[in-house]
A protein has these predicted regions:
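Long, low-hydrophobicity ectodomains and other hydrophilic envelope-associated domains
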Residues: 22-26, 30, 34-37, 61
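Compositionally biased regions
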Residues: 6, 10, 40-41
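Short, well-ordered secondary-structure micro-motifs within conserved domains or adaptor modules
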Residues: 37-73
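Surface-exposed patches in mature extracellular/periplasmic domains of secreted proteins
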Residues: 33-41, 125-126
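Structural motif
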Residues: 8-12, 52-58, 99-101
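Feature activates predominantly on carbohydrate-active enzymes
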Residues: 2-3, 11-22, 26-28, 74-151
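A sequence-composition feature that detects small, non-aromatic residues
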Residues: 12, 19-20, 33, 47-50, ...
Length: 151
């Protein structure tokens, strides 16, 4: 799937907004173009390649996916600061969901995606951001909880 937009709720917490802006910033560095950040209420129902970021309690699209059991319920399946990264087809449209049990988990999920899928290197003296032609994401189904809180 190719990422085309990032969707976060107007009622998102500061950490959820930080997660969305962080992903947007790195996407700009990868491809040299802006990926739009769209309110979950303004995201068109026919938006293919949307990244849905946030908690089920703040993002109605993620809540609907949890209720329809298209993605796991983070409150039941994760420890604090844990995250779920899931690609899926919903109504014929590709979506990438990054959610967590709490806002810190959403941010952890974004950083996991950046490191493990997009190859960003975070080092004491800086970071390494690979250049890409497009933002293609493979099929993913990741659920992770840290062994210790406050990663």
């Amino acid at each position: 799937m190719i990422l085309n937009s990032i969707s976060v709720s107007d009622s998102a917490s500061e950490l959820e907004m930080l997660a969305a802006r962080t992903l947007q910033d790195y996407c700009r560095q990868f491809i040299g173009a802006e990926i739009p950040l769209i309110s979950s209420h303004d995201l068109e129902t026919d938006a293919d390649g949307a990244v849905l970021i946030g908690l089920p309690s703040t993002n109605p699209q993620i809540d609907a996916l949890v209720r329809s059991r298209k993605i796991r319920n983070p409150e039941r399946s994760l420890k604090p600061e844990g995250f779920i990264i899931e690609t899926l087809i919903d109504g014929g449209l590709s979506k990438l969901v990054i959610t967590g049990r709490e806002p810190k988990g959403v941010l952890n999920g974004v950083y996991h995606l950046l490191r493990e899928i997009f190859g960003v290197g975070f080092f004491g003296d800086g970071r390494q951001v690979p250049k890409r032609d497009s933002l293609t994401v493979p099929e993913l189904s990741i659920a992770s909880s840290p062994k210790f809180n406050n990663q």
